[in-house]
Amino acid sequence: MSKGPISTFLQTNFKHFNAAALIEAAQAYELKLLEGHSMLVSLAGAMSTAELGISMAEMIRADKVHAISCTGANLEEDVFNLVAHDHYKRIPNYRDLSPFDEQELLNKHYNRVTDTCIPEMEAMRVIEEHLVRRWVNAASNGTRKFPHEYFYDLLLSGDISSSYQINPKQSWLLAAAEKNLPIVVPGWEDSTCGNFFASHCIAVSYTHLRAHETKWH
């Protein structure tokens, strides 16, 4: 594989300790790809809100990622960023926030992830509407899908393409959907959209989702 400027910089400067371990890990990754192996990437925490998609999406398009294991937060927050990026609020001094400051953010429907606030109405509620429609249809038809498959269907349908606020090439989930990569999402229920699903199962108007929920789990 040809070396770009970043690889050249790292090989020139990253010689010892954890820096050297980074080089060794990258070389091992490269060797596995050259040998024809498939690579599963595990995404922890909320890296989608840290805009990991800028680099991750390109890796997926270049066939350097073949499967993904991620948190429910990573799954949904890539789509939140895709449709509501312009409404996000950054808090550089988040360590100095008082309880009053936190309450003010809550009152304005901002959900803080370290130094970045996700807007509830422009991101979460917009995606909720599209997902609920798909969940209800699946329950009515007796269809069973993994969590990521509902997002794949949403992204590939074009239903939200007119609402994109970033370059779609920076969405790793869209890139994964276009490749139909398998995604494992342990603990999906511990996410915003997972809680949306549970709340609609509990709501009287969506009692028919409960049978679908039982089959799903």
For every predicted segment, state its role:
Residues 101-192:
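Ligand-binding beta-strand-loop-alpha-helix segment within the catalytic cores
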Residues 207-216:
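Conserved small/polar residues in nucleotide/adenosyl-binding loops
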Residues 46-59, 68:
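Thiamine diphosphate
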Residues 1-26, 30-33:
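N-terminal glycine-rich anion-binding loop in soluble enzyme alpha/beta folds
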